[in-house]
Amino acid sequence: MCGIIGIIGNDEVAPRLVDALKRLEYRGYDSAGIATLQNGRLDRRRAEGKLVNLEKRLAGEPLPGVIGIGHTRWATHGRPVEHNAHPHITTRLAVVHNGIIENFAELRAMLEAEGRKFETETDTEAVAHLVTRELEKGKSPVEAVRDCLPHLKGAFALAFLFEGDEELLIGARQGPPLAVGYGEGEMFLGSDAIALAPFTDTISYLEDGDWAVLTRNGVSIYDENNKPVERPVQKSQNTNMLVSKGNHRHFMQKEMFEQPEVISHTLANYLDFTTGKVRKEAIGIDFSKVDRLTITACGTAYYAATVAKYWFEQIARLPVDSDIASEFRYREMPLSKDSLAMFVSQSGETADTLASLRYCKAQGLKIASVLNVTGSTIARESDAVFPTLAGPEIGVASTKAFTCQLSAMASLAIAAARARGAIDEVREQELVHQLSEAPRFINQVLKLEDQIAVVCHDLSKVNHVLYLGRGTSFPLAMEGALKLKEISYIHAEGYAAGELKHGPIALIDETMPVIVIAPSDRLYEKTVSNMQEVAARGGRIILITDKKGAESASIDTMATIVLPEVPEFISPLVYALPIQMLAYHTAVLMGTDVDQPRNLAKSVTVE
């Protein structure tokens, strides 16, 4: 969601702040701004819309100074317009904020009663006035921030810059991530290591309740009880590889085409293709002692979790609940301490997923996580971490992170099956071999891009689309619908094909495309029956199947996308590609912002 950067250094800071903000664009935003100090005086520039608008503003109205803070805003309180953009300033300070101040209305009412005037609709401005009030009592900036933090309720990451003090930045974290970066004679604050990559690869992550005082020469970190603490210093990895789209039009397209390579890396981390066995040293969980698995996630990660539910139940004979994190955390479900709680997140900072993890941890469950960012909060609070190794994913609509999540959990399902005695060594080798073939099949599917792009000419002209699938193709149908509405803004729904007669069939007419995901597996004939029901009502079918399925369908389709014939186990990995390409090329034809679709954020760090 919102992105934060702070720099205290020796070089002109404005271009460095903008460079860092560009690296935070992937998080999603609707406005941006920076503030600097020059000769002790605060000044700022803000702009609605993309960073290019801020750059134009700065070209005409430069901001000098070697210390500053910057922000990309994803609106929560107040419209996405310039006067609500960060940084927010008073006569004494500038502040940027990621998160939600839940008691801002109460704080605002108190401050307005004291005669303080608010200029924006945001919750952040209440923080600015609250700290300013303490400064006006004669407190130092450190004392003022320290004394205000206990009065803030909600989730927040904050960075402060103070009028008249070019030697000080203060940051605070309660929920959304905030990292401290270490340089030579300069220091940094950032929402993640990606933002700090141009300047340093040496970072510490603040923990919940921490606040940090930065000078050019170092940092002092305090916990929620105001006691000095040290946080581990670590080297960040692979944060510079995101800056180029290469020969691709969008990051999303680039990331789709990276999938054969990154999936190979993921699988090789968990599987030994020479012996055909799971790498036991990579697992870190004794599945023989697990009697139930709960997998919790949000968005695309939830659909990956739902695919994995089928795998764990069918292959490992392990009962599984897959839950949406924002619902799970409030269900107050009974949990057995012999259960394993697994959490899936690209960023490792998803607010609802993290809250669900903490709920399970409080119940005494062992915690596992499947993550792309291994230095994240969820990783640090897990007993076992299973990295997806997808590399930075910049497009808001997930592609390679999704298939790498599937790859990791498919490997874990084999490990669980072997540990529980549900499969023998021969079957383990068969399944490992099938997964080893997935990158080759995915490469073949990528060669169908031009054919799929042609299908999208008709798809881009409709207002509603229905996706259908059975078995593991059902969560793929939901993921396909999510992809299409995320980036093309076409309304789409994903349903289990067997549910067609229980409501969705009422929507079918000659204007309604129905995308059917149907490999020629044991469920294919049932899905054909559903396609016949659609065809009988004039619905236009886009069938995604293999050669055998295409030849036996005997139904007129709007288009048929023929994929390689693959084993049922790996079909979700292979069939994920065409639904990504359908969404991508439809969005391109419609002229939307594919990498940064409206109203969406890459990392959802507030509830």
From Swiss-Prot:
Its EC number is 2.6.1.16. Pfam families: GATase_6 (PF13522), SIS (PF01380). It is an enzyme of class 2 (transferase). The keyword Repeat applies. Residues 2-217 form the Glutamine amidotransferase type-2 domain. The keyword Repeat applies. Its main location: cytoplasm. One of its GO terms (biological process) is UDP-N-acetylglucosamine metabolic process. It comes from the Bacteria. Homodimer. This is Glutamine--fructose-6-phosphate aminotransferase [isomerizing]. It comes from Brucella melitensis biotype 1 (strain ATCC 23456 / CCUG 17765 / NCTC 10094 / 16M). The lineage of its organism: Bacteria, Pseudomonadati, Pseudomonadota, Alphaproteobacteria, Hyphomicrobiales. The gene is glmS.
